[in-house]
């Protein structure tokens, strides 16, 4: 016997096998559930445009993409994921994407930003779950997404100079993080990781050029570094620098912010 039902984006097939022992007139029943998901596997999601205006998403699926991938014949390339599921592509170019996990709906999602929208896209069939009006509790007066980042238990969003950080367990973005009103993120560059705080704090570091100091954050709380006058490098008194890149270093632990050669290469 077999019965099927659609739960979210998964097809649940419940099978039952009955075996009859005719010698003793006994029936043995075995039940199991088979979950069938979408045809898309793990891979690299790429945003692209064909006409310079609209944009879409493609998925390159290959078990060893970064080591041996050498063309479509080595794996599967799925194109026009947004158009095929939603009826049309994004109306403008994609500016940022972030892969993360939605604890509320218990599914993997993509945050996708364009010049005038911020969307959540599920990764089974690439259906658009919501737009900027759904993403923000209070829609900002201006949408200018500069960064989308994974931090510890949170998603961090830089929009028009404001710092937002929302828990993975919350489906919507509220207001800018309290205490960050006077902070600015130079060039929108942040070094961030999502490791547990028991192993690595802080989860974010950035440079505030207006204050001339470095700032750091963890779990929706941000601080400006205090001055350390006796140190060769004073993170609380470092005016006139510019930040051009940031990330976690090759040791998979150290926050790194890259400054122009004329200043220095700083590791905080």
Q: How should each PLM-predicted stretch be described?
A:
Residues 2, 6-15, 264-268:
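Conserved small/polar residues in nucleotide/adenosyl-binding loops
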Residues 22-24:
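Short acidic/polar inter-strand loop motif in beta-rich domains
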Residues 28-41:
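C-terminal edge beta-strand
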Residues 47-113:
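Conserved, compact domain cores that house catalytic/ligand-binding motifs in diverse enzymes
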Residues 107-267:
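Preference for solvent-exposed, low-hydrophobicity sequence contexts
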């Amino acid at each position: 016997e077999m019965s099927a039902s659609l739960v979210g984006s998964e097809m649940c097939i419940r099978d039952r096998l009955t075996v009859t022992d005719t010698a003793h007139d006994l029936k043995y029943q075995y039940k199991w559930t088979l979950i069938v998901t979408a045809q898309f596997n793990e891979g690299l999601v790429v945003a692209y445009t064909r006409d310079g205006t609209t944009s879409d998403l493609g998925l390159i699926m290959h078990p060893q993409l970064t080591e041996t991938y050498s063309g479509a014949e080595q794996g599967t390339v799925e194109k026009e994921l947004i158009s095929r599921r939603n009826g049309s592509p994004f109306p403008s170019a994609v500016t940022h994407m972030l892969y993360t996990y939605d604890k509320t709906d218990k599914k993997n999602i993509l945050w996708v930003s364009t010049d005038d929208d911020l969307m959540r896209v599920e990764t089974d069939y690439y259906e658009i779950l919501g737009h900027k009006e759904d993403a923000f509790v209070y829609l900002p007066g201006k949408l200018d997404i500069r960064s989308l980042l994974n931090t510890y238990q949170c998603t961090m969003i830089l929009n028009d100079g404001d710092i937002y950080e929302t828990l993975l367990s919350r489906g919507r973005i509220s207001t800018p993080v309290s205490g960050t009103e006077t902070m600015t993120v130079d060039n929108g560059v942040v070094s961030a990781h999502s490791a547990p705080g028991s192993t690595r704090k802080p989860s974010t570091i950035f440079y505030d050029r207006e204050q001339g100091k470095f700032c750091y954050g963890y779990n929706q709380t941000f601080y400006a570094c205090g001055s350390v006058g006796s140190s060769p490098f004073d993170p609380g008194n470092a005016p006139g620098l510019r930040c051009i890149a940031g990330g976690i270093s090759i040791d998979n632990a150290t926050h790194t912010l890259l400054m122009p050669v004329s200043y220095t290469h700083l590791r905080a």
